[in-house]
């Protein structure tokens, strides 16, 4: 192919990453395709483990410990607050962190424990410059809760030191305080017997003599959900659990209510007796019917849980007060010190992640689409220009503008014409240049119908040439198809005289006659300026037609 390019061509899609992130956030809010639930202070946060692992090094180490079939679907952590985790999840899915004076300390501690350096640096900088922190809270900013730090460390070390997660009863606790805690994040305490079971507590795989009964449930703990491969084949047996890899379809013995279990048809043995008997194996028909009922029940229960959590989070977000956010922006951007206007963390590389979320400007109440666009809009009110050229010290409000500006110093011309090989520093220059090859002249004067390649040429034509509704006679010449048809100048060119008055009149008639035709633009700006000067001199020296 003539003029083509050999080899592969990379075609970028700038909005692809923001679309993916927006879709993941929509799935999280609706409880769709979430493969892990984080339980904090009784609140459930369904999310995607891949998103958490990409954002937090702590979750990455937690989720990658052990085999895939031995991973949990529910993790209960008590070393961070629910509000802090909610803010961090919003940051992971929307690239926007919402902080206020009331929760900045909790978010900072959670970011340190979960190893999220971006949030940690921002909160630390805000607290160091006293933008959000109060005077009576400064002594709490510089220290992390050591108890929560030990809990997070031991919680992670437990999964890393037990990759199979099959024998967790003899875990060597290094902290005696944690060993005596009533609420632990994993199976390290005695199970409290409770007659009623809601079917949402999952037990880890333990020896047969230590397994909880089918109607035992501990509401204050969230044990692990591991299963040996051998028991996956007999998942319908009492006391066993389905593999967590089966999309949340767990055994019906742990999901059914006592009333349903007593009245279940075809039950040959009592559930508790059957759970205590290792040799009990149901018949094929009973196991098939029981498994079918269990799958439907488990799927409906989990779907209701995910939906209720999503609706609860949406309702909480709608009821959230915006006063903290407004105070944050007003305090942050209202500072007169240069160190406050240009913080160090704001000069880092901005990620072009623009989640399609609607946010309202706290200053002018304008609704901004895109999570990453609100800080950029705020700079229009404050005049902040955090991005500075290290060569000429020119400042910019956006990083992409600084990147384009640097091409003036480096001479970089990344935009290449595939037809003639000409290189340009800006994309719009290449776009205008391509019209030379295509012949496209999209800008037309409404008065004289002259067409132009660029909009600034049309603007110059309207402003300087004085096109006021009739075809202009200054600074233009008629479109001539043959070189012999051009008028021959005579005498001094500065006088503007042409050979014979008839040819001059004929030239003017030609201009008026071709007023509605498309004319070729002058080859250069200097040539156009020369024509304007010559035309002005000719019109000024020669008397006009009577």
From Swiss-Prot:
One of its GO terms (molecular function) is DNA binding. Residues 34-101 form the BTB domain. One of its GO terms (biological process) is chromatin remodeling. InterPro entries: BTB/POZ_dom, SKP1/BTB/POZ_sf, Znf_C2H2_sf, Znf_C2H2_type, ZnFinger_BTB_dom_contain. It is found in: Nucleus. Residues 534-546 have a biased composition (Low complexity). Residues 189-288, 463-546 are annotated as: Disordered. A zinc finger (C2H2-type) spans 359-381, 387-409, 415-437, 443-467. Transcription factor that represses the transcription of a wide range of genes involved in cell proliferation and differentiation. Directly and specifically binds to the consensus sequence 5'-[GA][CA]GACCCCCCCCC-3' and represses transcription both by regulating the organization of chromatin and through the direct recruitment of transcription factors to gene regulatory regions. May also play a role, independently of its transcriptional activity, in double-strand break repair via classical non-homologous end joining/cNHEJ and in alternative splicing. This is Zinc finger and BTB domain-containing protein 7A. It comes from Gallus gallus (Chicken). The lineage of its organism: Eukaryota, Metazoa, Chordata, Craniata, Vertebrata. The gene is ZBTB7A.
């Amino acid at each position: 192919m003539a003029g083509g390019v050999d080899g592969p061509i990379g075609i970028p899609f700038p909005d692809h990453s923001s679309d993916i992130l927006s879709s993941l956030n929509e799935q999280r809010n609706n409880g769709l395709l979430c493969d892990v639930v984080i339980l904090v202070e009784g609140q459930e946060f369904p999310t995607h483990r891949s998103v958490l692992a990409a954002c937090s090094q702590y979750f990455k180490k937690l989720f990658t410990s052990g085999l895939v079939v031995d991973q949990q679907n529910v993790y209960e952590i008590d070393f961070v607050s629910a509000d802090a985790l909610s803010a961090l999840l919003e940051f992971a899915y929307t690239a926007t962190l919402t902080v206020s004076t009331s929760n900045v300390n909790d978010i900072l501690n959670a970011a340190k424990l979960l190893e999220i350096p971006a949030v940690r640096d921002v909160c630390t900088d805000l607290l160091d410059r006293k933008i959000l922190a109060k005077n009576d809270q400064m002594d709490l900013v510089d220290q992390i809760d050591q108890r929560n730090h030990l809990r997070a460390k031991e919680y992670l070390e437990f999964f890393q030191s037990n990759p199979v997660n099959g024998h967790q009863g003899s875990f060597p606790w290094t902290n005696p305080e944690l060993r005596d805690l009533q609420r632990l994040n994993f199976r390290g305490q005695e199970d409290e017997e409770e007659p009623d079971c809601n079917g949402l507590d999952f037990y880890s795989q333990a020896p047969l003599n230590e397994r909880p009964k089918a109607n035992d449930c501990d509401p204050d703990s969230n044990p692990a959900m591991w299963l040996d491969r051998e028991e996956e084949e007999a998942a319908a047996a009492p006391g066993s659990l389905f593999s967590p890899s089966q999309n949340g379809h767990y055994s019906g013995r742990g999901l059914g209510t006592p009333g349903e279990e007593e009245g279940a048809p075809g039950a040959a043995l009592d559930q508790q007796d059957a759970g205590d008997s290792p040799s009990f194996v149901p018949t094929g028909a009973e196991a098939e019917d029981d498994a079918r009922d269990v799958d439907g029940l488990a799927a409906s229960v989990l779907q209701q849980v995910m939906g209720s959590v999503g609706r609860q989070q949406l309702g909480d977000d709608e009821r959230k007060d915006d006063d903290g956010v407004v105070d944050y922006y007003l305090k942050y951007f209202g500072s007169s010190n240069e160190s406050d206007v240009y913080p160090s963390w704001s000069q880092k590389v901005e990620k072009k992640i623009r989640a399609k979320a609607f946010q309202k400007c706290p200053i002018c109440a304008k609704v901004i689409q895109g999570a990453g666009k609100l800080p950029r809009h705020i700079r229009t009110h404050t005049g902040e220009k955090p991005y500075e050229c290290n060569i000429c010290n020119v400042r910019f409000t956006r990083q992409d503008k600084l990147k384009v500006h640097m091409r003036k110093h480096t001479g970089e011309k990344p935009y290449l014409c595939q037809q003639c090989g000409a290189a340009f520093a800006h994309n719009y220059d290449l776009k205008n240049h391509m019209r030379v090859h295509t012949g496209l002249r999209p800008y037309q004067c409404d008065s004289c119908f002259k067409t132009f390649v660029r909009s600034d040429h049309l603007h110059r034509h309207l402003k300087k040439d004085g096109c006021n509704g009739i075809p202009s006679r200054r600074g233009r010449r008629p479109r001539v198809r043959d070189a012999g048809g051009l008028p021959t100048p005579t005498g001094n060119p500065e006088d503007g005289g042409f050979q014979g008055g008839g040819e001059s009149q004929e030239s003017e008639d030609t201009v008026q006659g071709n007023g509605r035709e498309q004319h070729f633009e002058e080859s250069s700006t200097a040539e156009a300026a020369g024509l304007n000067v010559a035309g002005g001199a000719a019109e000024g020296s020669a008397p006009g037609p009577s």
